[in-house]
Amino acid sequence: MVARIDANYQRRFSLQEVAAAEFVSEAWLSRLFHKEVGVSFVQYLTALRLRHAADQLLTTRKPAQQIAREQGFASTRMMSDLFKRQHGVTPRQYREQHPRELARPRPPQADRWQPVAVDRLYARLNEPEPRDRESPPLPINPPQTREINLHDRPARAAVLRHTRMVVTVRELDDLLREDVRRELEQLHRALPVYAIDINDPFLSSRLFGTGWDDPQMAGYACWYNLQQIFSWLAAMGWNVILHTGVTTRSDLLQRFLLLAANHFPPATLNSWRFVWHWSPQASEATRQAAWRQQREVLHRLLPQPQLGIWHRFAPSDPGNDPLFHSPLLAEADFLACQADANEQLDLAQADSSRLASSEHYPLHKLRQIHSALRQRQLNLPLWLLSWNTLTGDTRDTNGRFFRGALLMDNLLGVADQVWLAGFWLNSGLQGEARANGKLDTSSLALHYLHGLPRPVYWVLWLWRRLRGEILFQDKNLLLLHHQGHYQLLLRNTVVYNPWLSSEAAFIQRFSQPYSVRLQGLEGGWRVKQHLFDQHHGALFPLVDAFRSRSGPDAEDYQWLMHRARPALSVEDARLDGHWLRVDSLESNALALYEFTPQRAPGEDPAPASNP
């Protein structure tokens, strides 16, 4: 928008014209412009015209009337009034007070240096490059070079840790839907699911209607559906996370557990985990009474009950939360929480420090919670039921900005901190799209519509492939060894304010060239590369290809399902002591190389071990 103003300031130019060109409302654009630039549209345009007018007064002999006309002022008098208000003198007096400016020879273009306003600089940086569709992104970052000797292994290498994956659905009765069950079963075949999390309080389900536990009603009314759900979950081998809170009726909980104890084997009952929501609004006496009533019911009716506390910690300083001063925490079996980087950053204010801290916000928040638990000598497993990296709250920012490497970085970090991590099954159950046109960005969904995999699905898929000892790790590179096999994960992690990023021009400048040399590989190897970036596996660029108003049909969705996956390439290589790869990664791209030895008679391709 600033670039558009800079290019058109010399003619009659209005905010309404810009809003129409950007397909947004004039009022919304006016507020956004003031937030990002610091002044109103009219103030910025006037200052721009006055700056150019002052320059012409000092470097040309043009009359004020001509300068006013060329700089887009409605009249000479308007320019004169505005000029006097800013400089304290009229244009004629301003020219007379600087007589030497006219005679001063203009320096060569290469030697003209002057300060540039931040908004003008950003506008220039954000101008799209005239490039073809097939042109690769512009690499402006310096190449990253790594040379790793596989013989130089750490004395005690750490093993990469994977945490358990929990899949969230909205309500208990969602599990009666055939499409939801089919989607969960297909997901489990690709990514092992540890538990199903029922997000809403389970006793509020419509299945607990009148007569659900009345044996005189046909089939126990809704009990048949409840028994079908929990039997299917047990058959799949999944644990179940059920939510309660201060307002949960203990008598209803007791009736349900009594009936469940009479219909399900102990193994099924032992797979249930109960999460009690801490309420900051309730008094301590009310919280303790509700907690202990429900805890007593669970311990009386279940063979091995598990009851933990869920709490939404404040974005800043979660270690000083009142929850840590409550005696209930010592009675809990685990502590559940969420970590959303978007709650850390106000997108209306450009704050570089907060922007930088949001890159690994989930990890930082979890470490603060762990620290607070250790200070109170509490050793509770930490459950991360929902989380997200920095994004925006619109479809453009949330869907079309690729975040693969940013998600992987956070996943590698939180896996060491939590006992399990949660993801919504799909954006429909998540309720991602809100009525006001914004998006719920507090959590991550594995699928979009019709089971189409979103980027976090493939990040998890790549993450689950990783195994073994960590030989080398930094911000951009992870090298693993497992039973003679090697895995090399490269990533170009980029965090940015989505309100200030233009995908067509700004993001292409984050391409990262790299050169990696692995010293110590001999013999024959099969090398697989999984490449995941904006053009190889990202979902929304593929969806955008369908421009029909009715959207994709069944055949289109099958094509999308086939295409929305990382690119795979395989090569057989005979190596003479090293492997070298020189390439570049786009913004937030991931590249996983897997090295499998190809053994021949009398040949051992693995590098020699340390003496």
What role is predicted for each listed range?
Residues D81, Q93, Q97-R273, A282-H311, ...:
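Non-catalytic accessory regions flanking glycosidase/transglycosidase catalytic cores in CAZymes
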Residues W272, S283-Q417, A421:
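Noncatalytic carbohydrate-binding groove/subsite architecture in carbohydrate-active enzymes
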Residues Y9-Q10, L57-T59:
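Short amphipathic helical patch at the helix-1/turn junction of helix-turn-helix
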Residues N379, N388-K475, L480-H481:
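C-terminal active-site-proximal or functional interface alpha/beta core segments in diverse enzymes
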Residues F208-A218, D346-S357, T394-F401, N436, ...:
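Short, flexible/disordered intra-domain loops and linkers
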Residues R4-D6, R11-L48, A68-T90:
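Basic/polar phosphate-binding segments, predominantly the helix-turn-helix DNA-binding elements
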